[in-house]
Regions:
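S-adenosyl-L-methionine-dependent methyltransferase catalytic module, highlighting the catalytic core
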Residues: 7, 11-18, 22-23, 98-101, ...
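Hydrophobic adenine-recognition pocket in adenosine-nucleotide-binding enzymes
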Residues: 104
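Conserved N-terminal segment of class I S-adenosyl-L-methionine
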Residues: 1-92, 98-100, 114-117, 162-163, ...
Length: 200
């Protein structure tokens, strides 16, 4: 969710960061139904270089991050917002077809995440989808070790607030109004990362 170096993938340095960003983007793209791409997407916590939005096809693209864009992405409608302080999304109800939160949840405390998911539910169109990726809780210690030796960004890992599990994400989805029969989960990157989708 934090800002990134110009032309980079994540804030700070890490040998594996470009690979991990590409993996998240690839996973998210595979989880988006083709029929939704004719509408609007919002990427929450996209970073100041919006790698995923630059590598996905949608009619209209919107971005939220806590710092301004570091590069000129003319096709992206940019909004600067710190979601830990202000969880309300500045959009009308049923505005988006897809909302993505890639490597964002771990930067939010549970109360902020629940509030944000409520806003996501409000702004999704009926039939729309939210997609989340976040490190598995069991990967937390490994990620901190990888940050110490320069494989992943120490700045990003240092800002991880909470380590989530798939059952907990599912409970949060249900709490804000998503039907559990429309929630799906899985792992990738050898079980160290998780994805979750919920359809409104």
């Amino acid at each position: 969710m934090a800002a990134e170096r110009k032309g980079g993938f994540t804030r700070g340095k890490g040998l594996l960061e470009p690979y991990l960003a590409r993996q998240r983007a690839s996973r998210a793209n595979r989880l988006i139904p083709a029929e939704l791409r004719a509408g609007c997407i919002l990427d929450i916590g996209c970073g100041s270089y919006p790698y995923f939005l630059a590598h996905t096809a949608f009619k209209d693209k919107f971005a939220i991050d806590q710092l301004p864009a570091a590069v000129d992405e003319g096709e992206i409608h940019w909004h600067t917002l710190n979601l830990n302080k202000e969880p309300s999304l500045p959009f009308d109800e049923a505005f988006f077809d897809v909302v993505t939160m890639l490597a964002v949840a771990e930067h939010l405390n549970p109360a902020s995440l629940v509030n944000l998911l409520g806003e996501v539910h409000r702004t999704l169109m009926p039939g729309g989808r939210v997609i989340i990726t976040t490190p598995a809780a069991r990967a937390d210690g490994l990620l901190r070790w990888m940050a110490r030796i320069g494989l992943v960004s120490a700045e990003e890992i240092g800002e991880h607030t909470f380590a989530y599990t798939l059952p907990l994400l599912g409970w949060y989805f249900g709490r804000v109004g998503f039907g559990m029969e429309r929630v799906h989960f899985g792992y990738f990157e050898l079980g160290l990362n998780m994805w979750a989708t919920a359809d409104r």
